[in-house]
Amino acid sequence: LPADERIQRLRADRWIGYPRAVEALNRLETLYAWPNKQRMPNLLLVGPTNNGKSMIIEKFRRTHPASSDADQEHMPVLVVQMPSEPSVIRFYVALLAAMGAPLRPRPRLPEMEQLALALLRKVGVRMLVIDELHNVLAGNSVNRREFLNLLRFLGNELRIPLVGVGTRDAYLAIRSDDQLENRFEPMMLPVWEANDDCCS
């Protein structure tokens, strides 16, 4: 291969299926196939920065890609990034943007909430993944409480698994709410080490 092509290949993302990553994918598949019920199980994927959490989510999302037929979009796995501060309105904006929904200027929260719920159902979202969930701790206590209440509301209303992804701060945020702590099963991703698990 020419040098520039080799360089491009070296810079590209690479999936490394070390055992804990494969275990995380299997856990996501189990949740994805979970039958609809009143209280769905959720997952909290926790690990240090630059440890492959988002790559695991991207690999899973590609396994269940969005599609469209006629005038209908299908988005079985929706991945949304938590805004830099835990504002309910900003989260709904991010959620609607991830679904490609047009937003009118200065929408009111009740309208955004109803639109988001309607679209999540319409496009057939079966799992909602919230990346960078540790950003919940960036806000004040009132904003944090409102956002954690929103997570509970979405879980109850949609009856789909929620997956939080983030650093240890995400775990601390979820633990600050007794109900959410019972609903989110933490799965820790260890720090990368040069051992047999990571060698091919």
What are the residue ranges of the model-derived segments?
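Walker A/P-loop nucleotide-binding motif
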Residues: 37-59
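Conserved small helical "lid"/interfacial subdomain of P-loop NTPases
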Residues: 190-200
